[in-house]
Amino acid sequence: MDLKTIAEELVAGCRENRAIENLDRLYAPDAVSVEAADMGRGRVTEGLAGIRGKHEWWDASMEVSDGSVSDPMLHGEHRFAVIFEFQGKEKQTGKAFEMKEVGLYHVTDGKIVREEFFY
């Protein structure tokens, strides 16, 4: 897949609640995910299984009541960015949250090899 197709499919998957399903299609097996801050699980997650675990943790821990995912913004031949905005609550505590973050994705050989989040 080319950059534009990967970017559009990542966004569509997020909007249609297919993010975990898209991992195998869009990510390299050795992809790396980097968070802006350590939320108790470390900032860096390596490998597709670890990234899948992050998604599963989010789904188990957070209840999203509203949100949006921007259209992808392409940058050159190998990168794109997406803006995520969500409102919801932590399932365990009921504490409400609002978040806005930018995801920067790096693509090599038709797969996402690195994602970085800024918030």
Q: What is the meaning of each model-derived region?
A:
Residues 1-30:
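Short acidic-aromatic low-complexity motifs
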Residues 61-63, 87-98:
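Short, cysteine-centered beta-strand-loop-beta hairpins and adjacent loop/turn segments enriched
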Residues 27, 86-88, 103, 119:
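Short beta-strand segments enriched in hydrophobic/aromatic residues
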Residues 100-119:
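Short beta-strand edge/turn micro-motifs at domain boundaries
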Residues 76-86:
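A short hydrophobic beta-strand element
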Residues 66-68, 97-103:
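Short, surface-exposed coil-to-beta transition loops
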